């Protein structure tokens, strides 16, 4: 548990889930509640060259990673900053070996971890359909504030059509988002409460 009222997945749980994943070139992987980015970054720790190829001054992603998190105030925004800092740490060896890719990395870095500030819904305000081959996540599980989220969804026609709004709590909304965001045949590894 963190001072910011957020819960982060223990690293041993992240690693156990990541070890179950089968990766292939061209995959698009997402964590819709990425926090500090561990579900997306842990797979690259031991196999960085499977994810990124360097050709001259070009950094070419072989697998696309996308992490979303929400942030209205400075404390919430720190989480996505930490995800980007983690990415820099995980890729520091590659950058050190290839100093010409720093601008490419800066773009990748900002395209990978995206802060959602436009709505209390965060990622849920992005009605994505059949975009990802793999989703790895530990979405938030809270009941308080869920009615506010459902009210916000009800105000927006596109979101009202996207969500059934019958889900209990924010975790139900995230589960619905995950199912809709997966490509046909895609897989999701989701931490759920007991």
Give, region by region, the residue ranges found by the protein language model:
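Conserved Class I SAM-dependent methyltransferase catalytic core
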Residues: 164-194
């Amino acid at each position: 548990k963190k001072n910011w009222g957020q819960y982060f997945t223990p690293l041993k749980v992240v690693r156990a889930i990541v070890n179950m994943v089968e990766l292939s070139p061209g995959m698009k992987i997402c964590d819709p509640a990425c926090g500090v980015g561990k579900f997306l970054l842990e797979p690259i720790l031991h196999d960085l060259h499977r994810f990124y190829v360097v050709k001259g001054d070009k950094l070419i992603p072989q697998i696309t990673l996308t992490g979303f998190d929400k942030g209205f105030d400075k404390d919430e925004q720190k989480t996505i900053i930490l995800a980007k800092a983690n990415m820099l740490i995980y890729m520091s060896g590659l950058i050190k070996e290839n100093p010409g890719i720093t601008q490419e990395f800066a773009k990748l870095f900002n395209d990978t971890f995206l802060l959602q500030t436009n709505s209390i819904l965060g990622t849920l305000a992005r009605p994505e359909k059949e975009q990802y081959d793999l989703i790895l996540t530990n979405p938030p599980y809270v009941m308080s504030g869920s009615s506010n989220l459902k009210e916000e969804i009800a105000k927006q026609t596109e979101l009202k059509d996207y969500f059934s709004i019958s889900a209990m709590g924010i975790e139900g909304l995230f589960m619905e988002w995950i199912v809709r965001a997966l490509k046909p045949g895609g897989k999701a590894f989701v931490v759920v409460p007991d």
